[in-house]
C-alpha cells in the first residue's frame, strides 16, 4: 500500500473514531498518520491537515 493511501485511511479512521465517541483512538490514528507522513517526507499539506485535527481534539479536551 502506498504511503499516501495509508495516511488517508488513517485520517478517515480517526474521523470515524471521533464520530463514534472515541477521541483517544482518533488521536492514535492521527498520530500514526502524521508519523508516517513525516517518515515519507510528505508531511506538507497532509501534515498540516493532521495537525489541525489533533489541535481540534486538544481544544475539545480543554473544553470538556
Model-derived features: positions:
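Residue signature of alpha-solenoid helical repeat architecture, marking inter-repeat boundaries
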Residues: 4-5, 45
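Alpha-helical junction/boundary sensor with strong preference for TPR arrays
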Residues: 37-40, 44
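Alpha-helical linker/edge segments of TPR/alpha-solenoid repeat scaffolds
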Residues: 52-64
